[in-house]
Amino acid sequence: PFDTRGAVPRLPQQPYHMVSRVLSVTGPAGKQEAGLTAIAEYDVPPDAWYFEDGATGCMPFSVLTEVILQPCGWLASYSGFALSGETRFRNLDGSGKTARQVRPGDGLIRTTTTLTRCARVGPRTIVFVALEATLADGTPVVSLQTSFGFFTKAALASQAGLKSTDEARAFHDAPADPPDESETCLPVSARRLDLFDVIDRFEPTGGETGMGRIRARQAVDPYAWYFKAHFF
């Protein structure tokens, strides 16, 4: 039995579990080769919490990414890349296109995920996948090429993170200069998707491209719902 060969990463739990079913897989469990494909579906509840909390009436992008990336994690675990039970799973990068918003009446999202290649460097494994997400009638939603890494706890502890710049550090340390409330007209997310406490600095022409830069802050609640829901 597959579960006797080691511990593998599991999918997030509610309210961030975004796989309703896996319809098919083209190969047996533990097979690590390019071309392995899985088809998964997520039933979109018309009254889902994120439609209300997101304030736009559409599925928030943070939720959509879970819908399309969780099948990637499932396929990587199914393929046996983490059977040692000693590795952590991280999404690394991606390049894709979003074709449309997902709305309450759309029914379901079907994601076809294909393992394209993998690479091992010491205890690290990098897995590359391509996916297409559509509605039940085939209407395109997202196409994406992305990669994931399996890392040891020691490797994650020594990671350097994103390289900062003097300009970024100066912006981080700059005094508060919040926008005038009369200048803000867009609705903000609420409840579970209310993920900042305050916007304390706004530069309309800031940033590398001159198109604006904003600084938000949130006091991290160790009991926040997303810690338990998303792997932890």
Give the residues covered by each predicted segment.
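Non-catalytic linker/capping segments at the edges of enzyme domains
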Residues: 1-59, 78, 82, 103, ...
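Hydrophobic beta-strand-centered segment that forms part of the acyl-chain substrate-binding groove
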Residues: 1-4, 72-116, 143, 149
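A short, hydrophobic secondary-structure junction motif
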Residues: 46, 68-69, 98-99
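Active-site- and interface-proximal helix/loop "cap" or "latch" segments in soluble metabolic
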Residues: 61-65, 69-77
